[in-house]
């Protein structure tokens, strides 16, 4: 059963439903739009560096959420980017303090693109070789952020404002933290947060 949510002032309606596996789905269709936007968001962000599973406390380095976002694009046969490129869709992702979102914009092949979005996010494929390769890519991204005036200013401000809070940390993690992320960290986080229930 879908719940109907009226968006006041926009004359639009969103439908909300919950799948049997616990996944919450929002649907919005508008005759004004020709393209389709799809987003799958996981309630796991850069603040989630400590968590408890079965009464056992786990700690992962800052930057693990962003690292996992990157590495999820790898598949057993190629990358998610390759699939979406073939269908003419654009795919991207981003990590915030509180969640990670995988997004697809498509004009055609909506069902195939939606199925692949669900598949690549919900199917884990990690190995040590991938972890090491991705570290190099993310370290370069972190270096660029350390040289970007906007990023430096933003997190400098947050560092002053939130001296004793995780909000002071870069979402990407710093270089030392990125280097310390392990295959075990990635697998543990995925198995804890990237499940529907």
Identify what each model region corresponds to.
Residues 1-80, 187-197:
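His/Glu-rich zincin catalytic helix
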Residues 18, 75, 79-197:
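Charge-rich, well-structured scaffold segments of protease-associated domains
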């Amino acid at each position: 059963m879908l719940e109907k949510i009226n968006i006041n002032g926009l004359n639009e309606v969103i439908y909300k439903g919950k799948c049997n596996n616990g996944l919450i789905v929002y649907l919005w269709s508008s005759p004004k739009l020709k393209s389709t936007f799809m987003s799958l968001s996981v309630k796991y962000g850069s603040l989630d560096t400590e968590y408890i599973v079965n009464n056992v406390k786990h700690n992962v380095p800052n930057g693990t959420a962003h690292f996992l976002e990157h590495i999820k694009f790898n598949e057993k046969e190629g990358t998610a980017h390759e699939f979406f490129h073939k269908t003419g869709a654009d795919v991207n992702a981003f990590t915030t303090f509180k969640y990670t979102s995988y997004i697809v914009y498509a004009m055609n092949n909506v069902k195939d693109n939606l199925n692949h979005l669900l598949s690549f996010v919900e199917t884990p494929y990690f190995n040590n070789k991938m972890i090491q390769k991705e570290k190099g890519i993310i370290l370069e991204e972190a270096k660029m952020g350390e040289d970007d005036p906007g990023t430096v200013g933003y997190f400098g401000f947050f560092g002053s404002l939130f001296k004793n809070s995780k909000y002071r940390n870069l979402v990407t993690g710093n270089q030392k933290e990125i280097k310390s992320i392990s295959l075990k960290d990635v697998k543990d986080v995925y198995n804890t947060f990237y499940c529907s229930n």
